[in-house]
Amino acid sequence: AVALDPRLGYYAFEYDPRFVATGIDLAPLAMPLGKAQEPFVFTDLPELTYKRLPALLADALPDDFGNSLIDTWMASKGVAKSAITPLDRLAYMGKRGMGALEFRPTRGPNIASQTAIKLAKLVESARQAVHGEIDTEHHTKAALAQIIQVGTSAGGARAKATIAWNP
């Protein structure tokens, strides 16, 4: 679990005792299971890079393209960019991140459904998002939701999507 420590202003990470029992050491140098009795907090990491998170979690944050999609989505829901926390961004990554980690909020809906996509429409919607042309019309909102579903995790300087193909 991870939560903001109000005293320090940094996010504290604590292993669930059931996970500790598995013996899987996610970050053996920085957050070893042998020291899992107390929450881990890293106030010495550069805030700009790590967003006040442990490195293990900061590595899973979306890239600039993914962040712009999340910002646009949240704005359509009336949430200002300044109100979006790193935990919100991790929650939006869900199971779509590159790597083994998955994230979910402790409260709220847990939506996990697979849908077919139209690649040509997805590419056009991604172009619109990159150029800041996403508007608030229904079809564009649906396209944005689909881009967020497949495109917030691949990382890198260019927009891309991670999709499964089953002919």
Question: Predicted segments — roles?
Answer:
Residues 1-167:
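Phosphate/dinucleotide-binding and metal-coordinating scaffold of catalytic cores
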